[in-house]
Amino acid sequence: YVGSCLKWNRFWDFGTGQLGDMASHLIDLPYWALDLRSPTSCDGQGKPMHDDSYPGEVKVTWKHPANDKRPGLDLTWYDGPVKPGMPSKIFDRDAMGMGVLFSGEKGWLLADYSMRTVMLKGDMTHYDAPAATDLIPRSLGHHKEWIHACKTGAPTLCNFDYSGLLVEHNMLGAVSMRAGKKLEWDAKNLRATNAPEVDPLIRKTYREGWVLNG
């Protein structure tokens, strides 16, 4: 095992940079809370240091269709020097280091794993504190969830049916960056309808004797 994963995972042959690392943790929050699944398009932009390596500055935008709970929306990921603007000085982005900003019609929510700050547009008269029934389930913790699943057969919160789609979603950003173009995404068939040339980045042909079925 070679340590320093934040170095070697920036080479495409060995990893997928922060999109394959912290994005799985941070994008999980809006992906879970807003019931996101497969995007309709993805536009990944970055300033690569070298064709073989993950860019040092990244911005990726996915478009998600509406569902019965919410309208369509854009989800944008930033890493490196490029950062989103903050709607107010109340939000100290640099003090957080990393987090998620939800921007809605009536206000904003800035959150990470331990902190949540709400700022409303206008006064507070239209604000109703969420009821307990409106909250997403809390995790028991990785180890307790695993034991609970073994004993009851119940799925873990981040089971493969969920996490597989989340990782697929994030990796589409890496494919878009490497393609240098916005991709129109057909999730059912796992292909970019406007860029057949990226198929080798989506499906890998394994050497004879090394086959992965799935």
Model region roles, listed by residue range:
Residues 1-161, 165-214:
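Contiguous beta-strand/loop segments that form the cofactor/metal-binding neighborhood of enzyme cores
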